[in-house]
Swiss-Prot record:
This is ATP-dependent helicase/nuclease subunit A. Residues 526-853 form the UvrD-like helicase C-terminal domain. Heterodimer of AddA and AddB/RexB. Belongs to the helicase family. AddA subfamily. The keyword Electron transport does not apply. PANTHER family: ATP-DEPENDENT HELICASE_NUCLEASE SUBUNIT A, UVRD / RECB / PCRA DNA HELICASE FAMILY MEMBER.
Length: 1279
């Protein structure tokens, strides 16, 4: 039936029978087409046709299942057109509607519904909404903690004290996360108990024989391979340089030492040899003819190796068996208590679901698993009778996207497939044993393998959903390509999507950086993509572009001054990268007549001009970057749409409606009430709101309105309101003087609000929300605004959410608001309603995850200089599905806390797995492109970074694994791979990197590396803004030419106020302003002092900036304000306090990076820290205002005119504390210090006003004044 010309490998994937077949399908290999064709061939086989309902086809998404069903239906219909009388085709078309083409969850639900009688669940069960589940979980954990507190459960109390900090919400988060994590295991309770028992070591415990020791050794060997390369590179330099041959012997000894370590299989021997080794000293010979540059180079490389080996020595030296054993024994009770706590929580949560006849998403797989499995007398997990019936029913089980399977799904599929073997636990891990099992009934005819699995481990990017790529990898390594094998694999690496230029570039890059260590697979020539698509000769392909910009590129003061741009404004990195991308898109699209890129249109069968819809911008995450890019592209006139999962709850229409619901539930909330009052729903002006607030500033705003309402209506105030009225006559006068229109407006709103509150009790929440839309007219109003269609779509989503909520077990407005809040915080917001059609001519911005399975003519991958997200590694307890728990060691009695050995091992393992995931995500991103691929990124300090890249180029075939392991961004991988490519020569020359590379790679891939100039982008933007303003001014003045008022207008615009200088004197100054005034150059005249105010864009309109020096200072000051010195005995204590500020949302994780625990600890342990600890009266961040004569600051002013002029000096004193003989004033500074005297002079006037303020406020003497300088970890005394 198919007219497709299949490759030999594709034919094998379609027609191979009677085996378990793993199809390894690279990007663009046409795996879906192959899978569909295999199904068609099965159902139309002339010798052994199989009805389509006898196949189980498992897809990753519902959309994929629908597409597959549609493709099969189209193929059958096409066959019927050719042979209308075919009974087989007609039968298959009829059976298609009841075919088993579905997601794994749909199949599990089918199993549950067909076999509910075997379970203790109601046949009318409902799947609970995710947010409903979150609400139930919170109820369950609150109740559980209350019960355990009440009975004073000792294990629980110890857990709280060790891992909950001040609030038990921290421990609740640990329990909820561990519960979710455990549910990815087939048998969660067993997994939880096994992981805790891993800490239950006996007296004969020998760390050197454990899995942990082997892991440490293997991780260190990766580093040793890097050291080996460095030493080998050094030896090559020694042998090829003049006059340094005497270095050869010690370097050779070092290399032999490294080689010996790499051969060790025993941790004991490995550890012993590293600890015992002493590097031989280099000979101190002088040779006039010696190549000094080469000599210095090899010494540097050796020093680097020595330093790293010393670090490894120190680590291994701490791995003393008795110490580790004590650590395990100490942690065991806590970890056992944690496992039991999670099990108790799960039972309570399960009970709540059963009360409501609910199951959640995790239950679907686990209930199905319990139906399909049994245990035999040996305790092995084998198929149940129901599973054996499914084995009889399904002639073949086909699994799409197999690389994204988790262990629960793998066990389920093994139960319904005809596989020989059983599952059992070994060392706490569930493993499959491929052996014959004894069943009560012989399975005649069911011994022929029938499993078909298709996927690509290089595209496994769902580890965060507990996908386990190792399942695919195990079969990939075990299965054979030879025919007539029971377990066979076929590789499909011919790519039918992309141009040769894209494929060659992808192959080059991943051969360089992907390995078993990072990526979990060696990207060899065998794994490489092969060109399968033909684009003809009419249009030549273009090289892959890498566009780089230096974050640290200095813009001179002259340029900043010339363009009137603040340095921070100039260096907004995300904005500038967005601007760069906009310029690239403009160039690509051209003017749609000529000059733009031509792309091949598959539907037209010919080339056409590139359109905006052909372009996608991919990002690792879109939440912070996409809005900035949207704005930058829009400024350039480029239509753009960002597919994000954020922003919905920040839209004006949703904030207003949620505020309305909040005050209907409880009107005593000022912020939501004022939001509604200022909205078109109530239309109060700011002046009217001020008048209302004048009633009483100490009560809620609603209570003020209620008092006005009652007194205006001549209603008697009850005792509650009377309590707040000190002078009823005064209140009556305020109300009497109040505008009559305002009083009526207040009464109308109060009466409406009371009616709405009453109505909310009697109707369902979805009905009530629609009633409010109509009653207030807000839905229609939103539609009349700009982007009205989008706004109304957002309001409809809120209505749909309410409808969804109405079906849950929770009722009432209060619970709905709670539901929305949980939705907001648990799901990380939502994207706005999607009203854009697929064919809209816009550039799309989306995350790499959302692009999986899609393809685009042009792909721009942006944000490659952004750091990988490793925040999960900072938690006090880590979890790993194979290695178990990685807790901090916390001894509350001795007040000791540090990462345990097992935590460090698990932390490193998770880090490597995260890096492997990021490697695969990068692969997915680059393989979305059909014709053109552009990569953009920002770099910190271009010269230094490129030099680092050059130092990693010793191996032309591979970037060293240790370098890939230490990568923090995609550019950390891409850069070292490309810097040695032949196409990077001109780039290196541009940066004046003239040192000769011995390992330039002459690869067939084509690259174009561009260095973008921040200054030029900034200059372009400022010039564009100036032209726009200039044009508007010209247009206005042109219109004035014909006006009779021209002369008068010019006269008024030219008016100069007589006391212009006085108008420039502020009524208030901060201490910092005073400091700046006093350090002005002495030659500066008064006219310069009073230079005109420059109107600039308000800060709230500015885009998000990088952390500036001033913001850095603010963050450190904020931390010092909240620092508890009594709980700052170690760096870990300080990290804990930093994490608390992050949790309380005082600072973000990114901002926390500027706080150095080491520096804070030095302050705490220093003299000033100790003095603060000993003081009984410590005050932080004390604001003050004092009045002083203006002439004290502005000495140049006319003394007669300004003699009575006063200024208010305002400031905040960082810290002062009291000792027996007076006050001590302390101010923190984060400036970089070159000259102590300069610093003292700079801040002397500031400290003077702080001292004066303290004297006036406290009436006490300030005996000492200090500046603490964090840059040098020391203080200076101000006289």
């Amino acid at each position: 039936m198919s007219g497709t010309k299949w490759t030999d490998e594709q034919r094998q994937a379609i027609f191979t029978k009677n085996c378990n077949l793993l199809v390894v399908a690279g990007a663009g290999a046409g795996k879906t087409a192959v899978l569909v064709q295999r199904i068609i061939e099965k159902i139309l086989d002339k010798e052994e046709p199989i009805d389509i309902d006898k196949l189980l086809v498992v897809t990753f998404t519902n959309a994929a299942a629908a597409e597959m069903r549609e493709r099969i239906g189209d193929a059958i219909s096409k066959g019927l057109d050719e042979d209308p009388e075919s009974k087989v085709l007609r039968k298959q078309l009829t059976l298609l509607n009841k075919s088993n083409i579905m997601t794994i969850h749909s199949f599990c639900l089918q199993v549950i519904k067909n076999n509910f009688h075997t379970m203790e669940i109601d046949p009318n069960f409902r799947i609970c909404d995710e947010t409903e589940g979150i609400l139930m979980k919170q109820e369950a954990i609150d109740e559980l903690f209350d019960e355990l507190y009440e009975i004073e459960n000792e294990d629980f109390i110890n857990l709280v004290e060790s891992y909950a900090s001040r609030k038990d919400t921290r421990l609740q988060e640990v329990v909820l996360e561990l519960h979710r994590f455990a549910k990815s295991a087939p048998f969660p309770y067993t997994w939880l108990l096994n992981m805790a028992e891993g800490f239950n070591v006996g007296e004969n415990f020998n760390f050197e024989e454990t899995l942990w020791a082997d892991m440490i050794m293997e991780d260190m060997k990766v580093l040793l391979h890097g050291f080996k390369n460095m030493l080998q590179q050094s030896i090559d330099v020694i042998l090829n340089s003049e006059g340094i041959d005497y270095y050869y012997e010690p370097f050779k000894m070092d290399l032999s030492f490294i080689n010996s370590l790499l051969e060790k299989s025993s941790f004991k021997e490995f550890r012993g040899e590293i600890i015992a080794y002493d590097f031989p000293k280099l000979p101190l010979k002088r040779n006039k003819d010696a190549d000094k540059e080469a000599k210095e180079r090899v010494k540097k490389l050796r020093d680097k190796v020595k330093k790293k080996i010393v670090e490894l020595k120190n680590i291994l030296d701490s791995y003393e068996n008795e110490f580790i054993k004590k650590e395990f024994i100490f942690l065991y009770p806590s970890m056992k208590a944690l496992s039991n706590l999670v099990i108790l929580f799960d039972k309570k949560y399960e009970a709540k679901k059963r009360e409501r006849d609910l199951i959640d998403f995790n239950d679907i797989e686990h209930l199905c698993l319990s139906i399909l499995t049994d245990k035999n007398s040996d305790g092995h997990i084998i198929p149940s009778d129901i599973a054996l019936n499914y084995r009889k029913k399904f002639a073949e089980v086909l699994i799409d996207e197999y690389q994204d399977s988790n262990l629960v799904q793998e066990v389920i599929m093994s139960m319904v497939s005809r596989v020989k073997g059983y599952w059992s636990f070994y060392n706490g891990q569930l493993i499959f044993n491929e052996e014959e099992i004894n069943l009560e009934e012989p399975q005649i005819g069911l011994d022929i393998p029938n499993r078909f699995m298709v996927g690509d481990v290089k595209q496994s990017i769902y580890r965060f959903r507990q996908a386990k790529p190792e399942i695919f990898l195990d079969k990939y390594n075990e299965y054979n390509e030879e025919e007539d094998r029971k377990n066979r694999k076929v590789k499909l690496f011919k790519n039918f999507r992309s141009r040769e230029e894209v494929i060659n570039g992808v192959n080059y890059l991943f051969k360089q950086i992907m390995s078993k260590t990072i990526g979990e697979l060696d990207y060899t020539e065998e794994e490489a993509l092969k060109v399968g698509a033909s684009y003809g000769e009419e249009v030549k392909g273009e090289p892959i572009e890498l566009c780089l910009m230096d974050k640290k590129y200095e813009i001179s003061e002259e340029v900043l001054k010339e363009y009137n741009v603040d340095e921070e404004e100039a260096l907004d990195n995300i904005q500038l990268e967005g601007r760069l991308v906009a310029k690239k898109i403009q160039k690509l699209v051209g003017n749609n007549l000529e000059g733009g890129l031509k792309v091949f249109d598959k539907k037209l069968g010919e080339y056409r001009n590139l359109q905006y819809r052909d372009i996608v911008i991919l990002m690792r995450a879109t939440s912070n970057w996409a809005p900035v890019f949207v704005e930058e592209l829009a400024k350039e006139g480029i239509p753009v749409f960002a597919d994000t999962n954020s922003g919905y709850f920040d839209t004006a229409e949703i904030k207003t409606m949620i505020s309305l619901l909040q005050i209907i539930d409880n009107p005593l909330q000022d912020i939501p009430l004022l939001s509604v009052l200022r909205s078109p729903i109530a239309s109060f002006t700011d002046d009217e709101l001020i008048d209302i607030r004048m009633i009483n500033k100490n009560i809620t705003f609603y209570e003020c309105m209620e008092i006005i309402y009652r007194l205006y209506k001549n209603e008697k105030l009850d005792s509650y309101y009377s309590f707040y009225i000190e002078d009823e006559n005064k209140i009556n006068k305020i109300i009497k003087d109040m505008n009559e229109k305002l009083k009526n407006k207040i009464c109308s709103f109060i009466e409406k609000l009371k009616l709405w509150r009453e109505k909310s009790i009697h109707i369902d929440i979805d009905e009530f929300i629609w009633f409010l839309y109509v009653e207030t007219g807000y839905y229609g109003y939103a539609g009349a605004l700009q982007a009205g269609e989008q706004r109304q779509a957002n309001l409809r989503i809120l209505f749909q959410r309410a409808k969804q909520y109405a079906k849950t077990s929770y009722k009432g407005l209060f619970n709905f608001i709670n539901f929305i809040n949980k939705l907001k915080f648990s799901s990380g917001d939502m994207g706005s309603a999607k009203i854009l059609g697929e064919n809209e001519n816009v550039v799309r911005i989306m995350s790499i995850h959302k692009s999986k399975g899609l393809e685009f003519p042009v792909v721009i991958l942006s944000g490659t200089g952004k750091n990988f997200n490793m925040t999960d590694l900072n938690k006090n307890i880590l979890f790993h599905r194979d290695l178990g728990y990685g807790p901090d060691y916390v001894d509350t009695e001795r007040r000791i806390a540090y990462p345990s050995l097992v935590k460090n091992i698990i932390k490193n393992k998770i880090r490597l797995e995260t890096l492997s995931e990021e490697m695969r995500i990068l692969y997915v991103a680059l393989t979305r492109a059909r014709e053109k691929l552009i990569i953009t990124g920002l770099i910190n300090n271009m010269d230094k970074t490129v030099e680092d890249w050059l130092n990693l180029s010793e191996d032309k075939n591979k970037v060293p694994e240790y370098a890939v392991m230490s990568g923090k961004t995609y550019l950390d991988w891409i850069g070292p791979a490309l810097i040695k490519h032949k196409d990077a020569v001109s780039f290196r020359e541009e940066l004046k990197m003239t040192s000769e590379l011995s390992n330039i790679v002459d690869d067939k891939s084509k690259w174009k590396i561009e260095l973008w100039n921040k200054r030029e982008l900034l200059k372009e933007k400022v010039e564009e803004d100036e032209v726009e303003i200039s044009e508007k001014i010209k247009e206005t003045l042109m219109n004035l030419e014909e006006s009779n008022y021209k002369e008068e207008i010019y006269k008024r615009l030219s008016f100069k106020y007589k006391y212009d200088n006085a108008s420039s004197i502020p009524t208030k100054l901060s201490v910092s302003d005073v400091k700046k005034q006093f350090i002005l150059d002495e030659k500066e005249n008064t006219e310069e002092l009073f230079k005109k105010l420059e109107l600039r864009k308000p800060m709230f309109m500015e885009e998000k900036k990088k952390i500036s020096p001033s913001e850095r200072g603010t963050i450190i000051h904020l931390f010092m304000q909240h620092l508890d010195l009594k709980k700052a005995e170690s760096e870990e204590d300080i990290k804990e306090q930093i994490n608390r500020l992050i949790e309380r949302e005082f600072i973000t994780y990114e901002q926390s990076k500027v706080i150095s625990p080491y520096k804070i600890l030095k302050f705490c342990r220093g003299e000033l820290g100790k003095r603060i600890l000993n003081s009984n009266n410590v005050n932080k961040e004390m604001p003050f205002s004092i009045e002083i004569p203006a002439l004290e600051i502005y000495k140049e002013l006319d003394k007669e005119i300004y003699k009575d002029e006063k200024l208010i000096i305002q400031g905040v004193i960082d810290c002062y504390f009291e000792e027996e003989d007076g006050l001590v004033l302390l101010d923190y500074k984060t400036d970089y210090v070159n000259d102590i005297e300069e610093i003292k002079n700079r801040y002397e006037i500031q400290i003077k006003y702080y001292e004066e303020a303290l004297n006036r406020i406290t009436g006490k003497n300030v005996k000492d004044k200090y500046l603490y300088l964090f840059s040098v970890d020391n203080y200076i005394k101000i006289d």
